[in-house]
């Protein structure tokens, strides 16, 4: 899709980002339809994706998005938690409709449903994981753009972008796709970095830190595993009146069944 135009060619900085995010590193399995995008295979058995073909498919997907008059008619779905932030930021910078989290079945085919949508273009982060919206989109003639790994099926996918679809690779690819869409629209010039920030597309990992004391030092937790001594523990004292010498079933009410009553009558 670059057509030999220098402005549309893959830059060296973008190649470094793609290699750092492991966009080129596919899985150990490869679908027969994805073999055309595989460049080689490393010693660990992972398939290496051709980055030039990834860039060409990215340009094609950006042109398909820009062909839609209303950006809100483009729906992007991020099924897994690691893709939700990237899907939300992509919708924020491009004006598309983002659906983070679980996709409700029937959202494209059931008109009675409250969340029914009629998009003109669908973007999924994983055609294999998000197979439900892909199949519903194909049933109602919605074009599908998917970020496909080497083991992803291409059935019902119109534009497949070959790349690794883990959290870092998907964040980078969504950022590059949003940047290219804004460049085609004329919002961001190609000579400048633009307003789209890459770090906002990454999923933040929450790390639990120990509480700090009054002097800023980390406090020791009140109980640690392995420090409990059963010999030092004091056994509770039971009161003498808690156990009664009488029968345990004294005062209990018995409910007789009809067959038990008949047996007593026969004996009498």
UniProtKB/Swiss-Prot annotation:
One MF term in the entry's GO annotations: structural constituent of ribosome
One cellular component term from this protein's GO annotations in UniProt: cytosolic small ribosomal subunit
Segments forming a coiled coil: none
Principal subcellular localization: cytoplasm
InterPro entries, alphabetized: Ribosomal_uS2, Ribosomal_uS2_CS, Ribosomal_uS2_euk, Ribosomal_uS2_euk/arc, Ribosomal_uS2_flav_dom_sf
Location of region: Laminin-binding: 161-179
Subcellular location, record wording: Cytoplasm
Pfam family, one: Ribosomal_S2
Entry's Gene Ontology BP terms: ribosomal small subunit assembly; translation
NCBIfam families linked: uS2_euk_arch
Similarity section: Belongs to the universal ribosomal protein uS2 family.
Known role: Required for the assembly and/or stability of the 40S ribosomal subunit. Required for the processing of the 20S rRNA-precursor to mature 18S rRNA in a late step of the maturation of 40S ribosomal subunits. Binds laminin.
Quaternary structure, from the entry: Component of the small ribosomal subunit. Mature ribosomes consist of a small (40S) and a large (60S) subunit. The 40S subunit contains about 33 different proteins and 1 molecule of RNA (18S). The 60S subunit contains about 49 different proteins and 3 molecules of RNA (28S, 5.8S and 5S). Interacts with ribosomal protein S21.
HAMAP family reported for this sequence: Ribosomal_S2_euk
Protein name per the record: Small ribosomal subunit protein uS2
Native source organism of the sequence: Echinococcus granulosus (Hydatid tapeworm)
């Amino acid at each position: 899709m670059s057509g030999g135009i220098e402005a549309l060619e893959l830059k060296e900085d973008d190649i470094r980002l793609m290699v750092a995010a492991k966009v080129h590193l596919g899985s150990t399995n490869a679908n027969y339809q994805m073999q055309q995008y595989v460049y080689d295979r490393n010693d660990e058995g992972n398939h290496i994706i051709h980055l030039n073909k990834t860039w060409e498919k990215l340009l094609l997907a950006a042109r398909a998005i820009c062909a839609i008059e209303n950006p809100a008619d483009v729906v992007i779905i991020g099924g897994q938690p690691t893709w939700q932030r990237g899907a939300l930021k992509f919708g924020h910078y491009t004006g598309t409709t983002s659906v983070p989290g679980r996709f409700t079945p029937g959202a494209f085919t059931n008109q009675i449903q409250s969340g029914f949508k009629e998009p003109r273009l669908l973007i999924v982060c994983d055609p294999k994981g998000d197979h439900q919206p892909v199949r519903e989109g194909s049933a109602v003639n919605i074009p599908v753009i998917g970020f496909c790994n080497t083991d992803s099926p291409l059935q019902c996918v119109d534009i497949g972008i070959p790349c690794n679809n883990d959290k870092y690779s998907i964040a980078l690819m969504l950022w590059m796709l949003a940047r290219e869409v804004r460049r085609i629209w004329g919002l961001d010039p190609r000579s400048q970095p633009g307003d789209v920030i890459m770090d906002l597309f990454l999923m933040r990992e929450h790390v639990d830190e120990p509480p700090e004391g009054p002097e800023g030092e980390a406090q020791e937790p009140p109980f640690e595993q392995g420090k409990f001594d059963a010999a030092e523990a004091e056994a509770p004292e039971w009161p003498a009146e808690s156990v009664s010498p009488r029968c345990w079933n004294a005062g209990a009410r018995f409910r007789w069944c009809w067959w038990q009553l008949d047996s007593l009558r026969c004996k009498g």
